[in-house]
């Protein structure tokens, strides 16, 4: 589970939750800690929007955050005619990044269940330096070059981590059929 807030609007926050299955998600909803949170939520949250995503790539290392840890949340609108080609370029790039770059701690890619051309990317880096190093890697530069014409819009949402907790060890999986 990851909790983030917008860097430019402290009143806007995001929760990123990954579950092994629908059953695991239902178990979470039935657990006492969630029920306690849900009971207090109306006093803390004035508006809530849930976006259900279809996972395409999940990969992470065990994260022990510190003051240098950074998060990126990016939304990319992919032109329908490039959906498959975009996916076939970006997912292997993410796997390579996670496997060979020490400072890349987590990478997730998913599409909106209601708009499959809207991609969400959530990334965690050990530091700003590690993120800048990632941006200079040949595989990342190739991804940018190869996909530049495939999107209609890219939105980078400025976020800061509030709470980062994972079990780590999700292998860099390109989700089949996702």
Regions found by a protein language model. Give the residues of each.
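Short, well-ordered beta-strand segments in beta-rich or mixed alpha/beta enzyme
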Residues: 2-29, 67-77, 108-136
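Amphipathic, soluble alpha/beta structural segments
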Residues: 68-96, 128, 173-178
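Residue-level signal for well-ordered alpha-helical positions
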Residues: 28-31, 40, 89, 134-137, ...
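Short amphipathic alpha-helical segments
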Residues: 33-37, 80-105, 139-143
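Short loop/beta submotifs within extracellular cysteine-rich repeat domains
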Residues: 22-24, 36, 44, 94-97, ...
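Glycine-rich beta-strand-turn "strand-cap" elements at beta-sheet edges
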Residues: 2-11, 36-70, 106-117, 142-178
């Amino acid at each position: 589970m990851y909790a983030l807030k917008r860097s430019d609007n402290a009143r806007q926050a995001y929760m990123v939750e990954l579950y092994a299955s629908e059953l695991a998600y239902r178990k979470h909803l039935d657990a006492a800690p969630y029920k306690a949170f849900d009971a207090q939520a109306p006093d803390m949250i004035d508006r809530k929007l849930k976006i259900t995503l279809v996972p395409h790539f999940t990969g992470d290392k065990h994260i022990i955050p510190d003051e240098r840890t950074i998060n990126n949340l990016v939304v990319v609108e992919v032109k329908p005619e490039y959906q498959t080609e975009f996916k076939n370029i970006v997912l292997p790039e993410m796997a390579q990044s996670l496997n060979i770059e020490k400072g890349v701690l987590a990478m997730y890619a998913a599409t909106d269940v209601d708009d499959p051309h809207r991609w969400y990317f959530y990334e965690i880096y050990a530091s700003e330096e590690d993120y800048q190093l990632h941006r200079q890697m040949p595989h990342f530069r190739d991804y940018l070059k190869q996909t530049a014409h495939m999107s209609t819009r890219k939105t980078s949402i400025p976020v800061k981590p509030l709470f980062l907790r994972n079990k780590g060890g999700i292998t860099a999986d390109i989700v089949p059929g996702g």
